[in-house]
Amino acid sequence: MNHMDPNLPRAASLADLVDVTGLSRNVRRILEDVLEGREASEADGVALFAAAGRDIAAIVAVADHLRERVNGDRVSFVVNRNINFTNVCYMGCRFCGFAKRSDEEGAEWLSLDQIVGRASEAWSRGATEVCIQGGLHPKMEGTYYRDIVLALKAELPDMHIHAYSPFEIWYGASKRRMSYEDYIADLMECGLGTIPGTAAEILDTDIRKQLTKNKLSAERWVEIIRAAHSVGMKTTATIMYGHIDGPETWAAHICLLR
């Protein structure tokens, strides 16, 4: 699939962008293909992630050219405040430096008033969005996520709410015994704007078992994201790399998202 506007100007060749002397044959072939509008394969992605030396500069130049073709030099940003409403969680992800047990020093669980207060403070400072996430508190009611959204919208109707990872959607839907589609649709009706595609880490089953044995499987994460899209909810998607992963799993992760 070619996501670029065919009416935008194309580079005549890779040589128009970089000095091709010394480029590896495979990387040169991949870059020439994408400049002609062909989508890189998963194997191509592995090769690009493993690139070194002069190949890296060529990859950067082509990537920048493709970005400019699609979006010009327009840059945008959002003034956002992250509000983590609880750090109490018992999932035991090996990389997490955030989670506390409920009886541990530093454990917290914000009230609705505290969450709204922090969002109001952000609004007064120019924020137009809040990102709301937290641990999976064992005493949390299934309606708590919708209660947060309703409280925020009652006080700040124009604030965009970007909230609840697929893991949290799974948790809330499970507690309310609802399908993911129905649960997300209910949150949308309450005022949820978008869902952060966090908790993705690396979408590889073997790696996830080692890092996050109690977390969502890659298949379940994808199922929930697809459920969100099916009811008209937009999401982001993240990647967490640099631990026990590598070029093969990075490329597979991105191709799965694509």
Features from the language model and the residues they span:
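Flexible, acidic/Gly-rich N-terminal and inter-domain linker regions that tether
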Residues: 1-82, 86
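N-proximal short alpha-helices
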Residues: 14, 18-21, 29-32, 88, ...
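Flexible, active-site-adjacent loop/turn segments at secondary-structure boundaries
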Residues: 47, 73, 81-83, 87, ...
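N-terminal pre-triad scaffold of radical SAM enzymes
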Residues: 58-102, 107-133
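Bulky hydrophobic/aromatic packing residues
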Residues: 4, 9-13, 26, 49, ...
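Conserved Radical SAM active-site core
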Residues: 41, 100-257
